[in-house]
Amino acid sequence: MTLGQKIKELRECQGMLQKDLASRLGIGDTFLSKIETGQKLPKREYLKKLSEIFDIPLIEFETLWIASKINDIIKNEEAGQFALKHISKSNE
């Protein structure tokens, strides 16, 4: 699960509209939509707010945030693909 998927799932479970969560975070609902669909990654400072809003341990959001950043590096850089293959081979 990506960070955006987690945010969307939590928001929908609480019956919250995008505009309501965006307002609580201090961002636009268009930006929140892009976060939920994986087009954008929120600044790390928003993770604490999300943790408080959804009463979820901060580490859960931080883990997904870091995983998203690593994934972006790997998929957007040729060297990242080679590094991933190297890691896979060294773990065998």
Residue ranges and their predicted role:
Residues I7, L21-A22, L32-I35, F61:
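Conserved hydrophobic/aromatic packing and binding residues within compact polymer-binding modules
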Residues E52, E60-E92:
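Short, charged recognition helix plus adjacent turn
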Residues Q39-E52:
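Short, basic-rich loop-to-helix N-cap that marks the start of a DNA-contacting helix
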Residues M1, E12-C13, L41:
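Short amphipathic helical patch at the helix-1/turn junction of helix-turn-helix
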Residues G26-L41:
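Recognition helix of helix-turn-helix/homeodomain-like DNA-binding domains
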Residues Q5-R24, E77, A83-H86:
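Short basic helix-loop element that most often maps to the first helix and adjoining turn
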